[in-house]
Amino acid sequence: MRKLILATFLLLAPTALLASGGGEHLESANIDLRDQASLQRGAKYFMNYCTGCHSLQYMRYNRLAKDLGIDEIALRQNLLFGDAKPGDLITKAMTDDDALKWFGVVPPDLTLVTRWRSPDWVYTYLKSFYLDDTRPYGVNNVLFPLVGMPHVLGDLQGRQEAVMEPSHEPGGEPTIKGVKLVEEGGLSPQEYDTMVRDITNFLTYAGEPFQLERERIGRYVLLFLGFLFILAYLLKKEYWKDVH
């Protein structure tokens, strides 16, 4: 029994540690993968603001268009840039050499970002930039301290400052309690929240395009297993009726 308990603990402990994260407060993204309009807007925002530096190297344009209900004309007009073709993988415009020169690091591919982080993390991250004159691009991030990227949505969100909380220990450093808007951007806070939610929704879809289909098929699988259980139970009763 002890070995069974120990084995169960060893299996579940890594999952619990990953789920706990770093203890930061995350806002709920409240995404809906069934909201096709949100997914379409998120795809548009990602292509316009993110693909300069980030790729979705496991996703093709035509697969995205098929899943999100985007016809070829709209795909070519709104999502394809440069020499990109519908059958191409979604790559970034920037070369790795240029990325190293400008940022000191190659920006990560974002296909699986909501799976190895979480949708709530991505949503909160995009809302957590604040002014910091000590950083190369003048901004920092509450969730990702010393972030190396500029706030590409800053003109839309506006400028935020960090809200500091004094340390409760003598000689301790103040900590960041949150952020506050000090200069309005091109969008209202509500409009920016919706935009960030759409981007998060799209990235969640990109991380697992089959998720909705998997859930749909899963319901039939559970019904089949339930029916199979009933048959197995009736068969068991038939086999054992003479014994009892």
Swiss-Prot record:
| Pfam families, A to Z | Cytochrom_C1
* Family matches, as Gene3D superfamilies: Cytochrome c-like domain
Q: Where are the transmembrane segments?
A: 220-240
Membrane topology, as annotated, equals: Single-pass membrane protein
Q: Which GO terms describe its cellular component?
A: plasma membrane
Signal sequence range: 1-19
Subunit and partners:
The main subunits of complex b-c1 are: cytochrome b, cytochrome c1 and the Rieske protein.
This molecule's function is given as: Component of the ubiquinol-cytochrome c reductase complex (complex III or cytochrome b-c1 complex), which is a respiratory chain that generates an electrochemical potential coupled to ATP synthesis. c1 functions as an electron donor to cytochrome c.
Q: What protein does this entry describe?
A: Cytochrome c1
Record: residues binding heme c: 50, 53-54
The record describes its post-translational modification as: Binds 1 heme c group covalently per subunit.
Keyword line: Cell membrane, Electron transport, Heme, Iron, Membrane, Metal-binding, Respiratory chain, Signal, Transmembrane, Transmembrane helix, Transport
- The main location is membrane
Subcellular location(s) of the protein: Cell membrane
Organism from which the protein derives: Allochromatium vinosum (strain ATCC 17899 / DSM 180 / NBRC 103801 / NCIMB 10441 / D) (Chromatium vinosum)
* MF annotations from Gene Ontology: electron transfer activity; heme binding; metal ion binding
